[in-house]
Amino acid sequence: MKIKDLKKGKFFKPHLGKYEGQWVPPTWQKIEYDRKKRGWICYEVEGKRIAYFYPQEEIKEVYL
């Protein structure tokens, strides 16, 4: 999964720095994020936990 895969959908996450304003699938549920724009955001996507790490722009599946 790449950053470009996060473009479609209706759930809006406005706190990703240069990705501010980007739309992601509405099935993604925000779990947590770092207000200083460093750290990660974790989503649950169709039963899988996906983490977006920033500012290094890495996305990977995680198990929480």
Region locations from a protein language model:
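Intrinsically disordered, low-complexity, charged/polar segments
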Residues: 46-64
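Short, surface-exposed secondary-structure boundary micro-motifs
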Residues: 15-17
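Short, solvent-exposed secondary-structure boundary/capping segments
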Residues: 36-46
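Mixed-charge, Lys/Arg-rich low-complexity intrinsically disordered regions
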Residues: 1-11
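Hydrophobic beta-strand residues in large extracellular and virion-surface proteins
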Residues: 12, 28, 40-42, 59
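A short, compositionally biased
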Residues: 6-8, 34-38
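Short beta-strand-centered aromatic/proline hotspots
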Residues: 21-35
